[in-house]
Amino acid sequence: MFATSVVVGAVAGVLERTHPGTSLPHVPGWSRRAACFVALELMLVASIVMAWFAFVDPVSSFDLFDLSDEAVWFQVGANWLLSTFVFYWWHRFRHDSDLLWRWTHQLHHSPRRIETITTFYKHPFEVAADTLLNLSLSFIVLGASTDRKSVV
């Protein structure tokens, strides 16, 4: 999934540069600021995922559904369907909640340049909440497994 996201993002970024759909305003320092947010997001997500697998996963015995014996393609498909549904409503909720809007999500909508990199322009609290929600959906709700025996 991560590799797919990187490839899609890179292709979209190249297409934006080579075949722009609209002209973007010049914003001094935007590229550096956006790159810093992307780096921060990657470090934060990696840290949360490592902490999850070090501390939560070994002691977690609760799975609402147990997909660990299912094929990886089925786990990925079920996770995609569930997370797409949940994240749609979670996104709507961040727009409707004054607290979440002001403290996290407003930053994502603040840039004057709307482009692929803006996807990653998020407040660290929002990144942490999204990552924990995604991990919870995958491993607690669905009981997905990282065990290699479920590859078939």
What are these regions (language model features)?
Residues 36-48, 70-152:
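Membrane-embedded catalytic scaffold of the fatty acid hydroxylase/desaturase
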